[in-house]
């Protein structure tokens, strides 16, 4: 049987590591690019858009649909990087603790 005090210490350690990982993620920026850098989006580790840069060549009425597509692609690129980094950070924070199948961390 697992020692309860040992389990409690392990849980507290995991909580501290998770908190540190969340703080690190919140301070990290992810850049997504599309159209060969015609559109660039920077998001925070919380998935919030911080900045959008659009090449002037796309600021024409006839380029509206392409611009919309490029913004979507750039955002998804940045979000994917953020999500991958988040998973890697959390894996390190959990450091060998097994979670139940399907358990997902809420950020």
UniProtKB/Swiss-Prot annotation:
DNA-binding is among the record's keywords: yes
Gene Ontology annotations for the cellular component aspect, listed alphabetically: bacterial nucleoid; cytosol
MF GO annotations: DNA binding
Keywords, in A-Z order: Cytoplasm, DNA-binding
Gene3D superfamilies: Nucleoid-associated protein YbaB-like domain (3.30.1310.10)
SUPFAM superfamilies for this protein: YbaB-like
UniProt superkingdom: Bacteria
UniProt-listed Pfam families: YbaB_DNA_bd
Matching InterPro entries: YbaB-like_sf, YbaB/EbfC
Localization of this protein: Cytoplasm, Nucleoid
Keyword tRNA processing: no
Function: Binds to DNA and alters its conformation. May be involved in regulation of gene expression, nucleoid organization and DNA protection.
HAMAP family in alphabetical order: DNA_YbaB_EbfC
Oligomeric form and interacting partners: Homodimer.
Matching PANTHER family: NUCLEOID-ASSOCIATED PROTEIN YBAB
Similarity remark: Belongs to the YbaB/EbfC family.
Designated name of the protein: Nucleoid-associated protein RP866
